[in-house]
């Protein structure tokens, strides 16, 4: 599979020359999202987001899940069991998303993959005539975002990014109260995120976990050897091969709400103050003890 750089270069040139051929079947032309006709969907990426995404999709009675796709065997197994428990039905299992792109009967794909797959997967889905629900962030980098927009304008497919707080009733109510002036004039917004997630493991070479297709996981990214516990969530933090750090993980939510509350457009400039801080040992660090007459702060 080509790496991300060659993918962007090739597809940008192709769009400029309008060289793509529509691969829509007559059946696909007759399907309109939102109609009463059955809509065949596929899930790509069957990890942490699947419980919410699957339940949300199945709330619509005309939805039929055609495929459950993931590069890890046990993810497919768990999602298959979940789907059967919810519906009493089964869906086709697939590791390679390209086979789903080729299926003309699939109308839309719900993508919940690692970040580096987002723009590439969405563009290939649109090229094959499919609508896309895309988990945040919509791309791995700004160049891919521009490319994604070009694809959407050319293929005229529905692409929805999953910024769920935008559609949360609680958030919408809060934004309306701020707009109505219930807290006065807003002049500053502070975005933050707390989590009790465990420390990120140090990267060490390791064997590819059983059931994982490491080549397909890497997809459009550069090729490298597997390092411990990369595939399951920690891909977010290791360099920029697959993830976008907390900027793409949670800041995409929190900064969006902060900007929404202020009623402003995009910033003129961004200042970042950050550090690469990690612990290489579990030994106690130096600390300060304060004696408060029998009570202590350490």
Predicted regions and their residues:
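Mid-domain beta-loop-alpha active-site segment that forms a flexible
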Residues: 52-53, 162-170, 193-267
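Short acidic/polar active-site loop segments enriched in Thr and Asp
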Residues: 107, 187, 268
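A contiguous active-site-proximal alpha/beta segment in oxidoreductase catalytic domains
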Residues: 131, 138-216
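Conserved S-adenosyl-L-methionine
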Residues: 269-274
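Conserved small/polar residues in nucleotide/adenosyl-binding loops
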Residues: 279-286
């Amino acid at each position: 599979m080509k790496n991300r750089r060659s993918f962007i270069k090739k597809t940008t040139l192709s769009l400029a020359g309008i060289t793509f051929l529509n691969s829509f079947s007559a059946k696909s032309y007759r399907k309109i999202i939102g109609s009463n006709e059955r809509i065949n969907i596929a899930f790509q990426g069957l990890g942490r987001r699947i419980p919410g995404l699957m339940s949300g999709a199945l709330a619509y009675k005309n939805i039929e899940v055609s495929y459950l796709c993931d590069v890890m065997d046990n993810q497919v197994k768990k999602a298959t069991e979940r789907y059967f428990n919810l519906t009493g039905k089964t869906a086709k299992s697939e590791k390679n998303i390209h086979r789903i792109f080729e299926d003309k009967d699939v109308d839309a794909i719900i993508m919940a993959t690692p970040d580096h797959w987002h723009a590439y997967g969405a563009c290939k889905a649109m090229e094959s005539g499919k609508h896309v629900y895309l988990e945040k962030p919509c791309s791995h980098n700004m160049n891919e975002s521009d490319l994604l927009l070009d694809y959407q304008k050319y293929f005229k497919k529905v692409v929805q990014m999953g910024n769920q707080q935008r559609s949360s009733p609680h958030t919408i109510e809060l934004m309306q109260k701020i707009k109505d002036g219930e807290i006065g004039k807003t002049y500053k917004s502070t975005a933050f995120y707390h989590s009790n997630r465990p420390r990120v493991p140090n990267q060490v070479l390791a064997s590819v976990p059983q059931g994982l297709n490491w080549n397909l996981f890497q997809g459009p990214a550069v090729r490298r050897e597997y390092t411990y516990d990369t595939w399951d969530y920690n891909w977010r933090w290791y360099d920029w091969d697959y993830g976008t750090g907390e900027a793409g993980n949670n800041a995409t939510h929190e900064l969006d709400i902060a900007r929404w509350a202020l009623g402003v457009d995009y910033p003129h400039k961004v200042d970042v103050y950050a550090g690469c801080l990690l612990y290489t040992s579990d030994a106690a660090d130096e600390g300060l003890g304060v004696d408060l007459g029998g009570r202590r702060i350490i």
